[in-house]
């Protein structure tokens, strides 16, 4: 359900843990292609990635497969993207040239495979069966279904009001709005 404070709660939780945006975690909001999701997973391979309303990857078989690899239950997961792409290089091509591999990464390329030890959080308003029809992603995840009734939603909004902009506005005025 939209408007339930999912994004706010995730961001607050990350900050409360002392994590720093764009260093310890990154929030990707809106659209993301499969190859860019893969690239972000490489860049944050030991950190936390939050995909907020990036629902298109659920409809793409390659996106779902990369997610399944990233969400596997092993501590370290091997993720690969072995399709032709100008953004991907084969690490085997640089076995004798570590500096060349470093330069490829510095130039924005990503290896065709890498070990992932990070965490992924997806925030979506999609129905769980629509986002994950076969249940493969859910079987590798913790799903928190946020679909409160109207009374619970109003209670949640009242809890969040003091923290919402403009913070200097009186609480009674925010409640009236």
Task: Identify what each model region corresponds to.
Residues 23, 116-118, 131-154:
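A short helix-turn-beta junction within AAA+ P-loop NTPase domains corresponding to the substrate/partner-engaging
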Residues 154-177:
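Conserved AAA+ ATPase small/helical "lid" subdomain
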Residues 4, 16-48, 55-61:
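AAA+/P-loop NTPase substrate/partner-engagement loops
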Residues 1-10:
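Walker A/P-loop nucleotide-binding motif
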Residues 9-13, 40, 62-70, 136, ...:
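Alpha-helical scaffold elements adjacent to nucleotide-binding pockets in ATP/GTP-utilizing enzyme cores
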Residues 45-49, 77, 112-122:
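Loop/turn-to-beta-strand initiation segments
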Residues 3-4, 31-34, 54-57, 126-130, ...:
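Conserved nucleotide-binding/hydrolysis micro-motifs of P-loop NTPases
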């Amino acid at each position: 359900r939209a408007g339930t404070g999912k994004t706010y709660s995730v961001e607050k939780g990350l900050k409360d843990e002392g994590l720093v945006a764009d260093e310890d975690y990154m929030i990707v909001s809106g659209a993301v292609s499969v190859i860019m999701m893969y690239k972000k997973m490489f860049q944050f391979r030991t950190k936390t990635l939050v995909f907020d309303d990036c629902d298109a990857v659920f409809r793409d078989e390659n996106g779902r497969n990369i997610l399944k690899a990233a969400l596997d239950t092993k501590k370290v997961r091997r993720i690969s993207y072995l399709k032709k792409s100008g953004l991907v290089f084969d690490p085997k091509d640089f076995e004798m040239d570590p500096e060349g591999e470093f330069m490829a990464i510095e130039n924005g390329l990503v290896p065709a495979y890498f070990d992932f030890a990070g965490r992924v959080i997806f925030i979506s308003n999609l129905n769980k069966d629509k986002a994950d029809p076969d249940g493969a992603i859910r079987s590798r995840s913790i799903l928190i279904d946020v679909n409160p009734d109207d009374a619970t939603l109003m209670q949640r909004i009242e809890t969040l009001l003091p923290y919402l902009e403009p913070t200097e506005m009186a609480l009674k005025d925010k409640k009236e709005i």
